Amino acid sequence: MSKNSRLGTMMFLQYALWGAWLPVTARYLSAGVAEGGLGFSGSEIGMILGLAGSIGAVAAPFIAGQIADRYFSTERILAALVIIGGVVKWITAYQTDYSAWLVLSIIYSIVYMPTLALSNSITFAHMKDPDSDFPKIRVWGTIGWIAASWAFPMIWLQTDLNFQWMPPFIVGPEVANVTNRLADALIFSGVISVTYGLFCFMLPNTPPKKDAVEKLAFKKAFELFNQTSFTILVVASLTVSIIHQIYFLQTGPFLSSIGLKDSQIGPAMTVGQFAEIAAMAYLGFFLKRFGFRKVIFLGVLAYAARYAVFGTVTLPIWIMVVSQAFHGICYAFFFAGAYIYVDKIADEDVRHSAQTVFGMIILGGGPVIGGWLSGYLQETFTQAGLFDYSLFWYTLSAVGFVTALFFGFMFREQVEKRTAA
């Protein structure tokens, strides 16, 4: 097995274990006990999926950068973390108490979030031509997410599969206890995690770095706030990361409320990952042709457009499913474009720290604020036990639209002002 093939398999498993559980968990947590779910409130779900993610994002740089990079071979610490994470996910699947879910989700986030950086670190350490090789290897992560999101319902939630023209294309009658079985997505993720952990021992050896990380790197990275473009980007990114988090908190329950079967939620949401593959493939072209400001602006505007479609709840289900394609534009044009811009304006000796600072702000702050806001808006727009999804999504669309205008008018590229390291 070639080195690039092993790295591609690593990415496949890295994101497959995530795609196995994230799209359907909110639906399982929000469904009533009589339906087979846990009946948690919007605020509780926001804490489970929001606060946990934020804590993990803040802890990740310490675990990945200060411990893994210095004292252990990267592939071995990666193996340990994903195996521990798999066990935690398996245990979580059997819990019905909110407190247990919250604690276990925080533990899982602390061990899983660092693996995102570690898998990237291994990949970059063994590529001859990163600009050419990384997109080809990273795309297997998206494919892994799609594969897991499709495999679980086809194997465990449906019978007598048949082909249909609308995503998720391959469907069949649902099993009787389909909502209750959504919890098994966590077990499925746990199995993938343990498999991934064992596979890590087949990865190329990536020894710890002998040189200490420059202590002033973080201080220098924070000096990027002296550049107006970086400050504007961070403000817009924090806002976008908030409404981005709410997508994963509410889309599953929303699709169920308009008539999509529980077994079809995960596959339907992968329309966004298919679009992501295409958007990432052409991201370089768009950046060269239109520049960072216009591309990132379109990424933010895609959030407003997607939530506007969701808010028009009278539209057919197939339009709601197809509109998931906006997710690919949202992620590639905004998040990938933003990370590339940060890399461009940071001095070479602080690039890693700059990305870490940027990531901590949007991945640390966004999920916890998004989790709280999702619960608050759900309670605000619920009258007589009925949740008005239309007002909910239109509110988020307005936030996205205002953010797009703010970014479009205020942001000016400053790549040329970067000084040499």
Residue spans for each PLM region:
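A membrane-interface helix-boundary motif in multi-pass transporters
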Residues: 154-191, 376-400
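Juxtamembrane intracellular "pre-TM" segments in multi-pass secondary transporters
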Residues: 1, 174, 200-237, 257
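Hydrophobic core of transmembrane alpha-helices in multi-pass small-molecule transporters
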Residues: 12, 88-118, 122, 238, ...
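Central cavity-lining transmembrane alpha-helices of secondary-active solute carriers
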Residues: 46-66, 270-282
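Helix-loop boundary and gating motifs at the non-cytosolic
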Residues: 1-55, 229-270, 335
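Cytoplasmic membrane-interface "Motif A"-like loop-to-helix N-cap segments
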Residues: 68-82, 288-300
